[in-house]
């Protein structure tokens, strides 16, 4: 305890610093999709194409949001683990990219009327 009562024999300096800088929002990417199933391949494809055209009509005019259609797949559905084709399934994805999280979030909410969310990140 002797050191507590002795005066300091050196100068003591406290330093602190801070900096602040506004940075741009991170890039937000969302992928949505439509998937349809039915007996006739042409009918399934038409429903997928109609849903994607609707989504693109809404998404393309959105300021600051880049849109891109992704893979389009059509494949058979088999009955009860057999080799007999019982129908068809088709799927197409839509990629949205931008820095305005609020605008992308609102667009996703609207698009969920006909598309499902695959990922947001």
Spans of features found by a protein language model:
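Short, charged, surface-exposed interaction patches
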Residues: 2-121
